UniProtKB/Swiss-Prot annotation:
This is Coatomer subunit delta. GO terms for cellular component: COPI vesicle coat; cytosol; endoplasmic reticulum membrane; Golgi membrane; membrane; transport vesicle. It holds the Pfam family Clat_adaptor_s. Residues 271-511 form the MHD domain. It comes from Homo sapiens (Human). The modification N6-acetyllysine is found at K233, K241, K309, K351. It is a peripheral membrane protein. GO terms for molecular function: RNA binding. It is found in: Cytoplasm; Golgi apparatus membrane; Cytoplasmic vesicle, COPI-coated vesicle membrane. Belongs to the adaptor complexes medium subunit family. Delta-COP subfamily. The lineage of its organism: Eukaryota, Metazoa, Chordata, Craniata, Vertebrata. It comes from the Eukaryota. It is linked to Short stature-micrognathia syndrome: An autosomal dominant disorder characterized by facial dysmorphism, severe micrognathia, microcephaly, rhizomelic short stature, and mild developmental delay.
Amino acid sequence: MVLLAAAVCTKAGKAIVSRQFVEMTRTRIEGLLAAFPKLMNTGKQHTFVETESVRYVYQPMEKLYMVLITTKNSNILEDLETLRLFSRVIPEYCRALEENEISEHCFDLIFAFDEIVALGYRENVNLAQIRTFTEMDSHEEKVFRAVRETQEREAKAEMRRKAKELQQARRDAERQGKKAPGFGGFGSSAVSGGSTAAMITETIIETDKPKVAPAPARPSGPSKALKLGAKGKEVDNFVDKLKSEGETIMSSSMGKRTSEATKMHAPPINMESVHMKIEEKITLTCGRDGGLQNMELHGMIMLRISDDKYGRIRLHVENEDKKGVQLQTHPNVDKKLFTAESLIGLKNPEKSFPVNSDVGVLKWRLQTTEESFIPLTINCWPSESGNGCDVNIEYELQEDNLELNDVVITIPLPSGVGAPVIGEIDGEYRHDSRRNTLEWCLPVIDAKNKSGSLEFSIAGQPNDFFPVQVSFVSKKNYCNIQVTKVTQVDGNSPVRFSTETTFLVDKYEIL
């Protein structure tokens, strides 16, 4: 079977969306679709018509047609089966079978069509697999949007709460000022009230940085000296109040140093004309008493070529994985070549990879409940005492070849019981009194720093300290799949390339 094109058109032959799987000009495909309605015979029940050069296999969809254009020597049974799959794909992305709806989701349909057919030949996929393949790239964006919306809601709520607190503090200060002898009359009270109002305005503007102490405002007007003094006292009182609540207050210079250290930790990558991005994401759920409930890891090699002279290349893949991952190549990649020689190249060696776009050429997946596969084990042991709970938390790196950076282990705390009393700790900690969490921060966990512990005491019950959540990033991938060499198709000469490897957490919980 050789499929030339798949299209959705009107009954008059106007193309709404069309995907060509062979070299074909726009004029040619529009001419074929325009001739299609004239060939149909309404008196017959056939679902295909033929011309001297091509065959149309079609299915009516209300006021539209789903049309496959194939060669005349193709297998009509396979054509009909493929047509049914195309017809089932369209309602997945379009709520109504109308021209406007099809046009609005044209790119989604084209991506789905590409999963069904590659270079004119049907791929062995079903509807569920097509849905999975096309939605995979948008998962990260959905997570990012959800996190951003949550942060915006929390920031607005925090802004309103802070404004109410500061207004209440102003009213209390005014009441105390009227009762205190020799306060200075209405003039001083008016100046103090004005500076407090300015402080409320600035706090609302700066709510995106709730943990940074606000700097004094620039003075303006004739009473600038009084405002500076009042402002400084109000800020000091506000900072002392936050510290009493358990907040960590950073100065602006400390914030700059932290930002600079983060930038130094992640130096820019020198990208060559051929650049590979290897990314893995892990989703893991463990029980508090031990045992792995589920672990799922997804990985992908993305290829980006910035110079068209390196379009016809092959990637030499070294797979040292011993955990049993499932590998899957892109439909346009020669699967036989990859299976036999671990080479990633196009089925048609005369074609080139796309230029200036990220192309996923290899995916892999690992799903297991084998406890020995856990990269970083976390043991949380809360034990009740007379005044609450003594909590011991330990971590241990099980994969010695990994180096985990920016590790944060987040432990929930009971609300309304104050800050925890920290005993022994490896690394640093942050207490967030608003979210009632304790964050255990470790800059690096590797073979030289495989294990560590944290001890603290606080009022509460053992169930209050779960679920424990973990986040980290790593420049070494978990499954040990690497691109070791890149060569050109013609002459097998080596090509310079760069690689960027990232292993990060999608979800990592101890329930």
